């Protein structure tokens, strides 16, 4: 959730940054109007409370001096009633502000490039150059169907479109990749955790999926439960409503989970193949840090995911997302895009995001800093999306005879 105190101090600067993320002017105008009313009522309340303190002191002095206190007593009662009324008004305005604030995204960091969509993202660097083929490389769905690795028809029969069945070497590779990724993440200091694949509404509110993006979630009927869209949700919320006593070192977690998304906003993109599925496997990284450590940890997480792709011999690039392409909770994001020769383009395979204290404020995750309790910073990222990694291996390691070679680092996992 956005910092209402920071908003109070510098509304215009934060509002300008939010506009670059696509927040409509009328929403910001409504927020500003409500905020001005809140500040006015809060000032009146503070003045009434100050007056009450002065009257109370005067009342005590009058009693000690034997003066008539009836008029003063009456004034105290009247002022007390005004305080109660204004407290109710302030509470009501705070609730309205909170409800609006829950639907407003995290303002982008000042160094994030301003832009409207993915066309304005900035390529930072390329790791490994795409190799040339002496034949026309095929796309993963064609390879998968010919080899009997991917069964799209039976996926639809079992569920609906955007589901698939992995068979033969593809099923074994999926399992091998999960184990390989978890082992790799452990080398970077991430502790493996097994979490529930469902989450309640408070958990999804904490990481920002609710209330705004409920349409993209699969809800369990008659239960306050949803299928998780990413392991970021349970991993981050492990510390919801907690004060971490010792956060000298960042808490670094990794987990494998299936992920479930309706893809309500996909607009019919990537209907064919496995790029965009309702259910897909992913290995996630989450870090919980002191504010002053989050930039360093962000860089470490990017390095962790990138080195995983490099171990697999997969050409990829680092892309800084512009303000208009940032996710709801992210203040800064670097995408890793892997080269798919069959498609002849780079596709996202990992997003590493620093949410600063945005999720921590929603989930009330704090740490003990001397005598004070401070909000943590939370970070998350894929290391990696397993299905897309499988796709990348199929397309980059395809042979002229239609077979697919296996990266050497995976041989011991098969």
Swiss-Prot record:
Among Pfam families, the record links this protein to: Seryl_tRNA_N, tRNA-synt_2b
For this UniProt entry, the molecular function terms from Gene Ontology, in alphabetical order, are:
ATP binding; serine-tRNA ligase activity
User: Which positions are annotated as binding ATP?
Assistant: 261-263, 348-351
Chief location category: cytoplasm
Where does this one sit in the cell? Cytoplasm
Q: Which GO terms describe its biological process?
A: selenocysteine biosynthetic process; seryl-tRNA aminoacylation
Q: Which SUPFAM superfamilies match?
A: Class II aaRS and biotin synthetases, tRNA-binding arm
The metabolic or biological pathway listed in the UniProt record of this protein is:
Aminoacyl-tRNA biosynthesis; selenocysteinyl-tRNA(Sec) biosynthesis; L-seryl-tRNA(Sec) from L-serine and tRNA(Sec): step 1/1
Q: Name the enzyme group at the top EC level.
A: ligase
**This protein's GO CC annotations:** cytoplasm
User: Can you tell me which residues bind L-serine?
Assistant: 230-232, 284, 382
Its EC number is: 6.1.1.11
**Superkingdom classification of source:** Bacteria
* Keywords linked to the UniProt accession: Aminoacyl-tRNA synthetase, ATP-binding, Cytoplasm, Ligase, Nucleotide-binding, Protein biosynthesis
Q: Which reaction does it catalyse?
A: tRNA(Ser) + L-serine + ATP = L-seryl-tRNA(Ser) + AMP + diphosphate + H(+); tRNA(Sec) + L-serine + ATP = L-seryl-tRNA(Sec) + AMP + diphosphate + H(+)
Q: What is known of its domains?
A: Consists of two distinct domains, a catalytic core and a N-terminal extension that is involved in tRNA binding.
User: What family does the Swiss-Prot or TrEMBL record give for this protein?
Assistant: Belongs to the class-II aminoacyl-tRNA synthetase family. Type-1 seryl-tRNA synthetase subfamily.
Task of the protein: Catalyzes the attachment of serine to tRNA(Ser). Is also able to aminoacylate tRNA(Sec) with serine, to form the misacylated tRNA L-seryl-tRNA(Sec), which will be further converted into selenocysteinyl-tRNA(Sec).
Instruction: Describe its partners and assembly state.
Output: Homodimer. The tRNA molecule binds across the dimer.
PANTHER family cross-referenced by the UniProt entry: SERINE--TRNA LIGASE (PTHR43697:SF1), SERYL-TRNA SYNTHETASE (PTHR43697)
Q: What is this protein called?
A: Serine--tRNA ligase
């Amino acid at each position: 959730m956005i910092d209402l105190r920071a908003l109070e101090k510098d509304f215009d600067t934060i509002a300008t940054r939010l506009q670059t993320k696509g927040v409509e002017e009328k929403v910001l105008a409504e927020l500003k109007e409500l905020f001005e009313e809140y500040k006015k009522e809060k000032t009146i309340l503070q003045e009434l409370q100050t007056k009450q303190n002065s009257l109370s002191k005067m009342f005590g002095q009058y009693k000690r001096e034997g003066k008539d206190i009836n008029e003063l007593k009456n004034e105290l009662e009247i002022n007390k009633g005004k305080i109660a009324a204004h407290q109710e008004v302030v509470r009501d305005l705070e609730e309205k502000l909170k409800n609006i604030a829950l639907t407003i995204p995290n303002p982008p960091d000042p160094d994030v490039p301003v832009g409207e969509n993915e066309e304005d993202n900035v390529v930072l660097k390329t790791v490994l150059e795409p190799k040339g083929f002496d034949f026309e490389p095929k796309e993963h769905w064609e390879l998968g169907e010919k080899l009997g690795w991917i069964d799209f028809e039976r996926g639809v029969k079992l569920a609906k479109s955007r589901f698939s069945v992995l068979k033969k070497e593809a099923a074994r590779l999926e399992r091998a990749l999960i184990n390989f990724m978890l082992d790799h993440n452990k080398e970077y200091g991430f502790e493996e955790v097994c979490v529930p694949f469902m989450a309640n509404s408070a958990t999804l509110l904490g990481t920002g999926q609710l209330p705004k993006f409920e349409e993209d979630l699969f809800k369990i009927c008659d239960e306050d439960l949803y299928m998780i869209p990413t392991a970021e949700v349970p991993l981050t919320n492990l510390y919801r409503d907690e004060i971490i006593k010792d956060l000298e070192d960042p808490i670094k977690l990794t987990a494998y989970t299936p992920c479930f998304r309706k893809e309500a906003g996909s607009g019919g993109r990537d209907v064919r193949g496995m790029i965009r599925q309702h259910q897909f496997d992913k290995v996630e990284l989450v870090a919980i840090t002191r504010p002053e450590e989050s930039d360093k940890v962000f860089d470490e997480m990017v390095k962790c995911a990138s080195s995983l792709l490099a171990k697999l011999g997969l050409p990829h690039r680092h892309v800084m997302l512009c303000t208009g392409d940032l996710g709801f909770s992210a203040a800064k994001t670097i995408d890793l895009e892997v080269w798919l020769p069959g498609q002849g383009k780079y596709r996202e395979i990992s997003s590493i995001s620093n949410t600063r204290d945005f999720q921590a404020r929603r989930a009330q995750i704090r740490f003990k800093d001397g005598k004070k309790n401070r909000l943590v910073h939370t970070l998350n990222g894929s290391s990696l999306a397993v299905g897309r990694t499988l796709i990348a291996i199929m397309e980059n390691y395809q042979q002229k005879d239609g077979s697919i070679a296996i990266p050497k680092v995976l041989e011991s996992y098969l």
